[in-house]
Amino acid sequence: MIKLGIVMDPISSINIKKDTSFAMLLEAQRRSWELHYMEMSDLYLHQGEARARTRLLQVENHPQQWYQFDREQDLALETLDVILMRKDPPFDTEYIYATYILERAEEKGTLIVNKPQSLRDCNEKLFTAWFPELTPDTLVTRNAAHLREFHQKHGDVIFKPLDGMGGASIFRLKKDDPNVGVIIETLTEHGNRFCMAQNFLPAIKEGDKRVLIVDGEPVPYCLARIPAQGETRGNLAAGGRGEARPLSESDWAIARAVAPTLQEKGLIFVGLDIIGDKLTEINVTSPTCAREIEAAFPDISITGMLMNAIEERLEK
């Protein structure tokens, strides 16, 4: 029997209709795997050994009672076959420390999804720089003059922080926007923080598409997150609505171009953000949208693809 650990935000406060981590747990349980639940505060390192307080977990697709804890134990993480690192951002120093603890277990043979070193290496906004031919015009700087110049050049731009999630602090600036100065000051904290600028993509009207890749294999359907009226952000957390649809030709082309690098880096479950035919983000920490895609296209099991990939890797 495969022993699966998961590190996640408190299971008591998730929305099971939308939570991809929950879908992963349901699929693992369906395969009779043993589920070990952990939060960040349960992880610790002693004399170089990665350990945790874990609770055995049972899950159920039930709106009121979706989980039940069984016995609690303190164990070496190397006794688990696989651990899903599903903690949501912020990607802060605490998150980084957790990846070092998980890396100690990985060195002893536990499969970590996604690979701890790659979680540190591949910032969700910056990692697109490794694929410049696929992205909009993108500038990363803390220099106000560079940002003003970029705004002048394009006339319609998006400015965003490098560490946000769910569409937080994303600004659209059109030509002659009177707020350009204060937005640059806010995002760069007066030149002390890097931020990202990209030319505005009108195709956002058709949605910001989340394309999932499972161990190098693109899922054939995506979730297009369509901005609410008067919004430029498609994020569901910012009021966008999700619409599942098959991948377009350009989605396939982008996914296939990026997939081999992801697989090589041990990034087994990844969400690409695509607007029109441009790649805007590569989400590696805890990508979502599997539930919504599976609900719309019951012929596909994304979590099934993931558990198959885990089984294959464990057999190697």
From Swiss-Prot:
SUPFAM superfamilies: Glutathione synthetase ATP-binding domain-like, PreATP-grasp domain. Its EC number is 6.3.2.3. It holds the Pfam family GSH-S_N. Gene3D superfamilies: 3.40.50.20, ATP-grasp fold, A domain, ATP-grasp fold, B domain. GO terms for cellular component: cytoplasm. InterPro entries: ATP-grasp, ATP_grasp_subdomain_1, Glut_synth_pro, GSHS_ATP-bd, GSHS_N, PreATP-grasp_dom_sf. Pathway: Sulfur metabolism; glutathione biosynthesis; glutathione from L-cysteine and L-glutamate: step 2/2. ATP binds at residues 151-207. Its cofactor is Mg(2+); Mn(2+). Mg(2+) binds at residues 281, 283. Signal peptide: none annotated. Keywords: ATP-binding, Glutathione biosynthesis, Ligase, Magnesium, Manganese, Metal-binding, Nucleotide-binding. Binds 1 Mg(2+) or Mn(2+) ion per subunit. It is an enzyme of class 6 (ligase). Belongs to the prokaryotic GSH synthase family. PANTHER family: GLUTATHIONE SYNTHETASE, RIBOSOMAL PROTEIN S6 MODIFICATION PROTEIN. This is Glutathione synthetase. It comes from Photorhabdus laumondii subsp. laumondii (strain DSM 15139 / CIP 105565 / TT01) (Photorhabdus luminescens subsp. laumondii).
